[in-house]
Curated annotation (Swiss-Prot):
Originating gene: metK
Subunit (UniProt): Homotetramer; dimer of dimers.
Pathway it works in: Amino-acid biosynthesis; S-adenosyl-L-methionine biosynthesis; S-adenosyl-L-methionine from L-methionine: step 1/1
Gene Ontology CC: cytoplasm
Cofactor note as given: Binds 2 divalent ions per subunit. Binds 1 potassium ion per subunit.
Protein name according to UniProt: S-adenosylmethionine synthase
Organism: Vibrio cholerae serotype O1 (strain ATCC 39541 / Classical Ogawa 395 / O395)
SUPFAM superfamilies with a match to the protein in the record: S-adenosylmethionine synthetase
HAMAP family the record matches: S_AdoMet_synth1
Amino acid sequence: MAIKHLFTSESVSEGHPDKIADQISDAVLDAIFEQDPKARVACETYVKTGMVMVGGEITTSAWVDIEEITRQTVREIGYVHSDMGFDANSCAVLNTIGKQSPDINQGVDKADPKEQGAGDQGIMFGYATNETEVLMPAPITYAHRLMQRQAEVRKNGTLPWLRPDAKSQVTFQYDQGKIVGIDAVVLSTQHSDSISTADLREAVMEEIIKPVLPAEWLSKETKYFINPTGRFVIGGPMGDCGLTGRKIIVDTYGGAARHGGGAFSGKDPSKVDRSAAYAARYVAKNIVAAGMADRCEIQLSYAIGVADPTSIMVETFGTEKVSQEIIIEAVRQFFDLRPYGLQEMLNLLQPIYKKTAAYGHFGREEFPWEATDKAALLRDFAGLK
């Protein structure tokens, strides 16, 4: 690893057009799962000025009101008036949902549920590092926290002129792999026409940036770029169209780990793009929590209709405290990475997905794949004290 280097990650707010789409897709999934946890769902959403189109393939015994789910999701995000460029109450909602292909279904559903095949081929990665308390890379962790704070002060009235669309980016300085400071912070937020650029920049610094970023990492050399274009009134779906699955690096590790390319939102857990990526994070996090390595990346791969992974790779970047052979054997013994096994292991057949669709799928303790309940087992297995 370079002795000194910079690393940057970005996040986007719940009001970013792509995140609106992700949240609608996952809200549909959750609504269906409340009635039918065995449903097959692949829900895609497109948003643009004045309209939302929801499509995809869904096979279920449930009935859900797609239009009302869509409007309620947009409402909760905060687009409730045409002044913002998008209004949950008046936008058009188009529904183009069909059923899952029986050709796919025959490869997934088996007489013995434990032999459930993967819903598609693909590669998935999971990652963990001990540089933060949530075992996530610091740049993406703090980029998300800035966006969560933006939503908080927007919704609680502290900064009532804020609007839902926003982005953040944080550049960390590292020395021999350890954080030594924050080099740069970028935060752009949509706002009403009533606020001056100078007042906005001061308020964002005092109410969003300073409460979130640890003071010991900030210095006179830290650079701040707050609404660097000077004006951000037109935003949300009026500024850009949004699509489900277009923020896959924001959703995962901010570029600090590899990505298999598959998006998460709108997909039920039979889609290994989602469920196996969650399982890979769970494995990597437990390895790091057990003290077996400081950093760990897991790769899984699958073939459509086949239960067992076609490959499992463990990479610890030279930070392992026990041999690679012990780590690999521990993964084999303590983690069932077949589609049915990982659904059961992580209790994935429940309506928990809308919450994942903004501010990252990882590093948030409320999700089952963030548990470190196998760490003690792994420690004992590896002979670590």
